[in-house]
Amino acid sequence: MPWLQLKVIAPRRYVESIENALLAAGAASVTLQDNADQPIFEPGLGETPLWDNVKITGLFDAEIDTAKAIALAERRFGNPLPQHQWEQLEDKDWEREWMSNYHAIRCGERLWICPSWQEPPEPDKINLMLDPGLAFGTGTHPTTFLCMQWIDQQDFTDLEVIDYGCGSGILGIAALLLGARKVVGVDIDPQALLATTENAKRNQLPADAMPVYLPPHCPATQVDVMLANILAGPLAELAPTLSNMTKPGGKLCLSGILSVQAQSVMDAYAPWFDFDPVATHEEWVRLTAIKARA
């Protein structure tokens, strides 16, 4: 089905009003994008930050009367729309287009992340078959890649692992494929738990190899390796919890952390862990550590 896009450039103070105006004019959806190159880092609690200048894009049926749509939007907005233009959205098989742009990723000497619709480039390696879906974690993000590189270098034989904030389950599944006896997946998002379970099945892992839980239901246990690729704020808050769930002498691998946030996260875990040198990829870091023995 062909579509038209109405793109409006506006200061952030007008975003909500213009978004509502486009929906009132018949937009099927509205998306917001940065109109410059302004980064937004992790927000504080209760904050919903936006860029100073925002590109607001409304998606309309190609048969719409564009002049009428503009008139309806401006009536709802109460003023002429700021800088705007219509664009034809090419009619494509978007699923096939997306699939063609997602490729296998090598994560070290042993591990590959492979989309399930492609043949693994190196069939004799350990190939984690993944269908990226609604949950975070495909290997393309620097934080996931950093964690996967570290996992590739470890001996997981017969170890127990927690993947805290499991997303797609990619980190925990990699540990299982490298010999871990059991991995527990934990996430606040039920969709992530479903994605993890489906991806574990896709990799032909036993049904009981990776049980998944919402945090309140996670069993009280201690594991040999703690993996957590989330965000700096939650990681710092979770330091006592993740420490209690890690055995003395156990390993910790954290990411989802910007370089400028690394020290504050390390400080939160310092009472329990001794850190290795920081690993960096682009503006992101990976922190690894050993829990001090009692």
UniProtKB/Swiss-Prot annotation:
It is found in: Cytoplasm. One of its GO terms (cellular component) is cytosol. SUPFAM superfamilies: S-adenosyl-L-methionine-dependent methyltransferases. Disulfide bonds: none annotated. It holds the Pfam family PrmA. S-adenosyl-L-methionine binds at residues 144, 165, 187, 229. It is an enzyme of class 2 (transferase). InterPro entries: Ribosomal_L11_MeTrfase_PrmA, Ribosomal_PrmA_MeTrfase, SAM-dependent_MTases_sf. GO terms for biological process: methylation. It catalyses: L-lysyl-[protein] + 3 S-adenosyl-L-methionine = N(6),N(6),N(6)-trimethyl-L-lysyl-[protein] + 3 S-adenosyl-L-homocysteine + 3 H(+). One of its GO terms (molecular function) is protein-lysine N-methyltransferase activity. Methylates ribosomal protein L11. Belongs to the methyltransferase superfamily. PrmA family. This is Ribosomal protein L11 methyltransferase. The lineage of its organism: Bacteria, Pseudomonadati, Pseudomonadota, Gammaproteobacteria, Cellvibrionales.
